[in-house]
C-alpha cells in the first residue's frame, strides 16, 4: 500500500441524499482557542432543487431522562448553537477553504459544499454522566452535534431520515508543564494532650494520566497520648454542575483503608498507591466520564482546565480530583475505642490524557498493519489519496446498531437523583 492517505470520516443521511465529511471526531481545546470544525456536505442536486443547505453545530447539556420530556418541556439546555448556510453560501458564512476542504471538493465534485465552525473556548468539554442500570434514553451530560439538512429556511421541521447527525467531542489534553508538587499538612491539638498530632501528605507529581498509579506519601508525627487506629486514603472526583445554579457532586473512585496504627509519642511514614479505574466504578450512577462516541468505551472524566477569567456559569460540567488522607484517631479515656475523631488533608491533582504525538505526514506501512489511531489525518501532496471511513464505528459484538440506540437509548441518570 505505500503511503497512508488522508483519513476522512463520513456519514450519510438515512435517505442517502446527504453525506457529511469530517477530518476528525475529536477537536482539541487549547485553552485560548479550539480546533475549528471544518468539513464538507455532499448533496444530491436532484434532491436539493431550489432549497438551501444548512449545517448546525450545537453544544447541549442534557440533565434529565428523555422519557420525562412531556408537554414540550425537555431536560436539555442548549449552551451554544451556530448555523451556517453552506449553499448558496451566505456572505457572512464565507470563509477561506482549509486544505482538507479544498481536497474534498476536488475529489467529490461541485455538489460538495464547505462549512466551518469556531467553538468558543469557554464552552465545556464533552462529558457523560454514567447511567444507572435502569435508566433509559440518552445519557446525561454535555455533547456536541453537527447536523446537516436541506430546507427552505432554518425554522422548517426536518425529519431524521432527511438529515445527517454526527456527535463530535471537544477534548483537552494534559499541559506540557505540570503544576507544583501537591503537598498538604495539618496539626491537631487534642484535649488532655500537651503536644499535637501532625499529618503531612504529598503526591509524587501534579499530573497523572488515565490508568497511571498515584503514589501518596503519608508522614505522621504523633506527640499526643492518642492512638491513630486507621489510615484511609481515597481518590475523589468532584463534578461542579453549572446550570441554573451550581451544585457539586463528589464520588470516590479509588480507596484504601489501611490498618496501620501510630502509637502515642511515635512517628510513621509510608507510601500508598492507588489507581482510579472506571472498571472499578461501573455501578456508580452519575459518575462523570469523558464524552463517549458510539460503540467506544470511555474512561473517568478528565480534569477541566480553565483559562483565567473564564465565566464558570456558562460551563456545563467542571471536573476536578483530590486525594484525601484521613487519620482515624482514638480519643482514649473512658470511652476508649468507642469514640474517635478524624484528622484529614486533601491534595488536588490533574487527571488527563497526554497530548498525542504528531506523526510525520508520510509513513511507510505494511499492508497487514492496522492503523492504531483512526482519528489521525495525514496530509500529503496527492489530492486523490483520501481514505474514507464511516463515521459510525464498526459494529462490535453485542452492540446495538444506530436504530436500536434511537429506540432503546443507552441510559441516563437524572441529576436530581444523584
Swiss-Prot record:
Keywords of this entry: Cell membrane, Cell projection, Coated pit, Cytoplasm, Cytoplasmic vesicle, Membrane, Nucleus, Phosphoprotein, Protein transport, Signal transduction inhibitor, Transcription, Transcription regulation, Transport, Ubl conjugation
SUPFAM superfamilies: E set domains
Binding site for 1D-myo-inositol hexakisphosphate: 250, 255, 324, 326
Compositional bias annotation for Basic and acidic residues: 355-366
UniProt-recorded Gene Ontology molecular function terms: alpha-1A adrenergic receptor binding; alpha-1B adrenergic receptor binding; angiotensin receptor binding; AP-2 adaptor complex binding; arrestin family protein binding; clathrin adaptor activity; clathrin binding; cysteine-type endopeptidase inhibitor activity involved in apoptotic process
Interaction with TRAF6: annotated segments: 318-418
Region feature Interaction with SRC, mapped onto this chain: 1-163
UniProt record similarity statement: Belongs to the arrestin family.
Function of the molecule: Functions in regulating agonist-mediated G-protein coupled receptor (GPCR) signaling by mediating both receptor desensitization and resensitization processes. During homologous desensitization, beta-arrestins bind to the GPRK-phosphorylated receptor and sterically preclude its coupling to the cognate G-protein; the binding appears to require additional receptor determinants exposed only in the active receptor conformation.
Stored SMART domains: Arrestin_C
Effect after changing residue 121 to E: Impairs interaction with SRC; impairs ADRB2- and HTR1A-mediated ERK phosphorylation; no effect on sequestration of ADRB2
Modified residues (Phosphoserine): 412
The protein, known as: Beta-arrestin-1
Post-translational modification: Constitutively phosphorylated at Ser-412 in the cytoplasm. At the plasma membrane, is rapidly dephosphorylated, a process that is required for clathrin binding and beta-2 adrenergic receptor/ADRB2 endocytosis but not for ADRB2 binding and desensitization. Once internalized, is rephosphorylated. The ubiquitination status appears to regulate the formation and trafficking of beta-arrestin-GPCR complexes and signaling. Ubiquitination appears to occur GPCR-specific. Ubiquitinated by MDM2; the ubiquitination is required for rapid internalization of ADRB2. Deubiquitinated by USP33; the deubiquitination leads to a dissociation of the beta-arrestin-GPCR complex. Stimulation of a class A GPCR, such as ADRB2, induces transient ubiquitination and subsequently promotes association with USP33.
InterPro entries, alphabetized: Arrestin, Arrestin-like_C, Arrestin-like_N, Arrestin_C-like, Arrestin_CS, Arrestin_N, Ig_E-set
Lineage, uppermost ranks: Eukaryota, Metazoa, Chordata, Craniata, Vertebrata
Expression across tissues: Predominantly localized in neuronal tissues and in the spleen.
Species assigned in the record: Rattus norvegicus
Gene Ontology CC: basolateral plasma membrane; chromatin; clathrin-coated pit; cytoplasm; cytoplasmic vesicle; cytosol; dendritic spine; endosome
Effect of residue 53 to D: Inhibits internalization of EDNRA, EDNRB and ADRB2. No effect on interaction with SRC; impairs ADRB2- and HTR1A-mediated ERK phosphorylation; impairs sequestration of ADRB2
Gene3D superfamilies given in the database record: 2.60.40.640, 2.60.40.840
Residue ranges, annotated region (Disordered): 353-374, 397-418
Pfam families attached to this UniProt entry: Arrestin_C, Arrestin_N
Recorded name of the encoding gene: Arrb1
Subcellular location: Cytoplasm; Nucleus; Cell membrane; Membrane, Clathrin-coated pit
Residues modified to Phosphotyrosine: 47
Amino acid at each position: 500500500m505505500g503511503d497512508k492517505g488522508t483519513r476522512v470520516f463520513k456519514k450519510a443521511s438515512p435517505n442517502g441524499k446527504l453525506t457529511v465529511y469530517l477530518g476528525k471526531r475529536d477537536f482539541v481545546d487549547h485553552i485560548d482557542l479550539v480546533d475549528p470544525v471544518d468539513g464538507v456536505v455532499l448533496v444530491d442536486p436532484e434532491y436539493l432543487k431550489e432549497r438551501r443547505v444548512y449545517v448546525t453545530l450545537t453544544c447541549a447539556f442534557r440533565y434529565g431522562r428523555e422519557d420525562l420530556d412531556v408537554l414540550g418541556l425537555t431536560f436539555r439546555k442548549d449552551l451554544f448553537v451556530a448555523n451556517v448556510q453552506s449553499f448558496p453560501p451566505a456572505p457572512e458564512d464565507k470563509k477561506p477553504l482549509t486544505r482538507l476542504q479544498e481536497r474534498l471538493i476536488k475529489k467529490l465534485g461541485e455538489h460538495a459544499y464547505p462549512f466551518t465552525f469556531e467553538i468558543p473556548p469557554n464552552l465545556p468539554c464533552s462529558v457523560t454522566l454514567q447511567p444507572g442500570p435502569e435508566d433509559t434514553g440518552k445519557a446525561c451530560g454535555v455533547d456536541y452535534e453537527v447536523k446537516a439538512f436541506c430546507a427552505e429556511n432554518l425554522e422548517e421541521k426536518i425529519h431524521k431520515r432527511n438529515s445527517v447527525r454526527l456527535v463530535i467531542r471537544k477534548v483537552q489534553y494534559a499541559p506540557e508543564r505540570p503544576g507544583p508538587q501537591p503537598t498538604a499538612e495539618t496539626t491537631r491539638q487534642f484535649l488532655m494532650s500537651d503536644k499535637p498530632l501532625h499529618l503531612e501528605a504529598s503526591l509524587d507529581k501534579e499530573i497523572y494520566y488515565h490508568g497511571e498509579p498515584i503514589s501518596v506519601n503519608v508522614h505522621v508525627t504523633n506527640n499526643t497520648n492518642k492512638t491513630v487506629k486507621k489510615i484511609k486514603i481515597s481518590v475523589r472526583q468532584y463534578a461542579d454542575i453549572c446550570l441554573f445554579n451550581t451544585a457539586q457532586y463528589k464520588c470516590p473512585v479509588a480507596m484504601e483503608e489501611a490498618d496501620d496504627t501510630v502509637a502515642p509519642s511515635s512517628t510513621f511514614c509510608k507510601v500508598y498507591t492507588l489507581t482510579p479505574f472506571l472498571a472499578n466504578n461501573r455501578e456508580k450512577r452519575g459518575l462523570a466520564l469523558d464524552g463517549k462516541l458510539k460503540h467506544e468505551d470511555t474512561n473517568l472524566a478528565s480534569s477541566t482546565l480553565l483559562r483565567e477569567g473564564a465565566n464558570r456559569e456558562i460551563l456545563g460540567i467542571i471536573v476536578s480530583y483530590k486525594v484525601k488522607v484521613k487519620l482515624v484517631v482514638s480519643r482514649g479515656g473512658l470511652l476508649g475505642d468507642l469514640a474517635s475523631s478524624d484528622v484529614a488533608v486533601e491534595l488536588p491533582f490533574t487527571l488527563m490524557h497526554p497530548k498525542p504525538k504528531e506523526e510525520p505526514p508520510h509513513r511507510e506501512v505494511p499492508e497487514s498493519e492496522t492503523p492504531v489511531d483512526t482519528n489521525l489525518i495525514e496530509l500529503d501532496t496527492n489530492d486523490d489519496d483520501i481514505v474514507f471511513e464511516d463515521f459510525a464505528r464498526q459494529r462490535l459484538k453485542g452492540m446495538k446498531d444506530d436504530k436500536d440506540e434511537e429506540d432503546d437509548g443507552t441510559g441516563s441518570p437524572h441529576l436530581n437523583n444523584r
